[in-house]
Amino acid sequence: MLQVLLVTICLAVFPYQGSSIILESGNVNDYEVVYPQKLTALLKGAIQQPEQKYEDAMQYEFKVNGKPVVLHLEKNKGLFSEDYSETHYSPDGREITTNPPVEDHCYYHGHIQNDAHLTASISACNGLKGHFQLRGETYLIEPLKIPDSEAHAVYKYENVEKEDEGPKKCGVTQTNWKSDEPIKASQFILTPEQRAYMNANKYIKLAIVVDNVMFRKYTGNFTAIRTRIYEIVNTLNLIYTILNIHIALVFLEIWSKGDSINVQSVVDVTLNSFGEWRERDLLNRKRHDNAQLLTGINFNGDTIGFGFVGSMCIPKKSVGIVQDHSKTHLLVATTMAHELGHNLGINHDGDSCTCQANSCIMAAKLSHQPSYQFSDCSINELWMYLISHTPRCILNEPLTTDVVSPAVCGNYVVEEGEECDCGSLWYCRNPCCDAATCKLKPGAECGDGVCCYQCRFVTAGTVCRPARSECDIPEYCSGQSVECPMDHIQKNGKPCLMNHGYCYNGRCPIMIHQCIALWGPGTTVSSDVCFQRNESGQGYSYCRRENNQNIPCAPQDVKCGRLYCKFHNVNTLPCNFKYSDFAPDYGLVDHGTKCGDGKVCNSNRQCVDVNTAY
């Protein structure tokens, strides 16, 4: 609990009961008018920096249902990555990228006094705007647009008239990942490397893309769009705090000139297109772990979101799409939390899943009542996904090499002069780190990391990054550092999968696996006669494209062009293929794939001798 000095700014608190009013969240049937009284909360012994516009910690007192409450707030220092940037496009299509100053921002997390749970997500940019929980009920607060007045409206979420009474749902109908056995996390015995992975802090560097329809929905007002996104991510960050996953906004792109993909109301088409665009375009411009498309279009039916399951850190699939379906940012943030949960391997809740709320985050049908909580099933599935897949990208702390501002203790980033950083006094769960000083506690050798366990360096020789395949090489802790050594892989061209393939960049690419990835289980590679189509260069049958022209395959290269697959059911077409007008390489045989005895497909889609290919 914060030790604070209270400095009272005397503002009267006059509750007023209203019947109906139109606010930003919509038409509200019952509300109170309050005048929050600010109690400036200074950390004991700390001095507020004169150049800092927004304080690190604040308290406000006002009445709810005629009874006084105190709202404790602390700045969410982990909201933005240090290298946060924004991109939009001029009317003539020029890319405009900026690095706005976000260190002294106005977004806070907090709680109501005498309630230990962090359930408040508040913007203090112009008055208090956001939501909090009190005695299990969700309340919203926002300033009233009255000149020269400190008046705010406080109201229960249930008193907001529903924009659409129809049920809403997620588009995921089947999982792409499922644990081999329904083992409970508590029954699982971890290996040393799994234990090290689970003990390490998890960071998701999030990129959000706003499509052109949403840009026009907000009448091209960049400030309004930024505010909307910041409020959503502040709530998203709050929701994932309970899972010990820190979400930092690293990038915002606004398609102000036009969409970079064909955003359709068909969710699976849009999701696949967005994933392909992320892999070929966005990842080359901005390093991040996960991207979410926020769109103003209405998806088909009652679907408002869609995401790949168990796909975190996969270039083409660590994505989700979310419809901006409500005036209340809390509901949109809950939907984004749901789709991000799918990316983290969490499936929809079954009937037996429970949480301490009327609705849980991963319910298949999304409730009109917002939820801050994951069910017991969700927590177990996340745990199982992390220990079985160990997605590596979320172990990387936000870059410190790009930091140009002074070190900030409490933002989860270990910067110059710090030995550890576990967040604020409220958030810190690290027994090795002093949250007030960002220094290790006496006797601690380390704070966190895959090679740190119980504040001590892990024994030298402990596996910290197991081999992901026979084309990978395991790495071991040194016993003197928290870091796992640089990732190394087997030499390209080494035979793998019982000589069915050759190693390429740490993988063993073979055609049958690529067919299954494109078409699902029950598929295999088509006969050679199908691949001969690639000699024509017609339609989608080619080896590569240059200057918008199809380049046909030479006879010896046909198995390096379009990939043809067939289903085991003999009644289906024998030469099935996939393509995308937005990603010319989609559906082609992967580089490094075996195309004959002792031969592999090179980057120019030629079938060459494996001994000279690399």
UniProtKB/Swiss-Prot annotation:
Residues binding Ca(2+) 2: 472, 475, 487
Requisite cofactors: Zn(2+)
Amino acids binding Zn(2+): 338, 342, 348
Name the record gives this protein: Zinc metalloproteinase-disintegrin-like protein F1
Record: active site: 339
Location of the protein in the cell: Secreted
Protein origin, superkingdom: Eukaryota
Family of the protein in this entry: Belongs to the venom metalloproteinase (M12B) family. P-III subfamily. P-IIIa sub-subfamily.
Propeptide, chain numbering: 21-192
